[in-house]
Curated annotation (Swiss-Prot):
Residues 58-78 have a biased composition (Low complexity). It is found in: Lysosome membrane; Cytoplasmic vesicle, Autophagosome membrane. The chain crosses the membrane at residues 178-198, 232-252. Keywords: Autophagy, Cytoplasmic vesicle, Lysosome, Membrane, Transmembrane, Transmembrane helix. Pfam families: Neurensin. Expressed in heart, lung, and placenta. One of its GO terms (cellular component) is cytoplasmic vesicle. Plays an essential role in autophagy. TMEM74-induced autophagy may involve PI3K signal transduction. It comes from Homo sapiens (Human). It is a multi-pass membrane protein. Residues 52-88, 123-143 are annotated as: Disordered. GO terms for molecular function: transmembrane transporter binding. This is Transmembrane protein 74.
Length: 305
């Protein structure tokens, strides 16, 4: 039974090699499918090697007979294949041996491991003309770096707007114009109140006071009234100045708000053009037709480039 099992495994390996040799002369997609089949056969062969070695060790310990029949079945006659195919398939043989080596190295962790990078390299080597034909530069598509730069610019502008709005909302930027306007208004109101609270006339009875003393008191009250009049004028001027500053600040804030709203709307419109849908619309450089490029195709182009 052990000899029969070993002969069966070696026959499977021979069939895989035969499929590999027979698929060398196939052009185009058939060569690609043949290469993938050869890789899968090599993977199965590599997966069956540890079991075969264990059974061979037990067989040698039990009966030291030479497995001549299995060696005869496992050896492949080179005369059965034409020499041209042998010479043309040397590069792909080495690549498939690399696949088998990778499979044998990864058997300890995974049983169904296939190195996709090596398969992609084999496919790129086998069909360079197809790859050159499908190059995105020939189709007239724009460089994807332009899209990335536009997206980065829009994101940077949005981040700057967010940081400025956060700074103003958190109170880090002090508005000195508003503070000065409030101070002017408060000072003007206080001056007007003080000028009307302080009495201007003399409250002393003229019958109890001498004439010269009464004249002196009247002069002092007149001087005080003049100062109070100046305080009223200064208070009114400060109130007017504070009102003008507040109105200017209000107009400036409305103008800045309108500019911010327009910039925000423009940036959101650009971001909607870039990220609003699953399809990018790009104009070709040769004609005015539009091409729709999905996200999956964009990733494929990035991998190929």
């Amino acid at each position: 039974m052990e000899l029969h099992y070993l002969a069966k495994k070696s026959n499977q390996a021979d069939l895989c090699d035969a499929r590999d040799w027979s698929s060398r002369g196939l052009p185009g997609d058939q060569a690609d499918t043949a290469a993938t089949r050869a890789a899968l056969c090599c993977q199965k062969q590599c997966a069956s090697t540890p079991r075969a070695t264990e059974m061979e060790g037990s067989k040698l310990s039990s009966s030291p007979a030479s497995p001549s029949s299995s060696l005869q079945n496992s050896t492949l006659q080179p005369d059965a294949f034409p020499p041209g195919l042998l010479h043309s398939g040397n590069n792909q043989i080495t690549a498939e041996r690399k696949v088998c080596n990778c499979c044998s190295q990864e058997l300890e962790t995974s049983f169904t491991y296939v190195d996709k990078n090596i398969n992609l390299e084999q496919r790129n080597r086998s069909s360079p003309s197809a790859k050159g034909h499908n190059h995105p530069g020939e189709l007239g598509w724009e460089n994807p770096n332009e899209w990335s730069q536009e997206a980065a610019i829009s994101l940077i502008s949005e981040e700057e707007d967010d940081t400025s709005s956060e700074a103003t909302s958190s109170g880090k930027s002090i508005d000195y114009g508003f503070i000065s306007a409030i101070l002017f208004l408060v000072t003007g109101i206080l001056l007007v109140i003080i000028s009307y609270i302080v009495p201007r006339e003399v409250t002393v009875d003229p019958n109890t006071v001498a004439a010269r003393e009464m004249e002196r008191l009247e002069k002092e009250s007149a001087r005080l009234g003049a100062h109070l009049d100046r305080c009223v004028i200064a208070g009114l001027c400060l109130l007017t100045l504070g009102g003008v500053i507040l109105s200017c600040l209000l107009m400036m804030s409305m103008w800045k708000g309108e500019l911010y709203r327009r910039n925000r709307f423009a940036s959101s419109k650009e971001s909607a053009k870039l990220y609003g849908s699953f399809n990018f619309r790009m104009k070709t450089s040769t004609n005015e037709n539009t091409l729709e490029l999905s996200l999956v195709e964009e990733d494929a182009l990035a991998v190929q480039s």
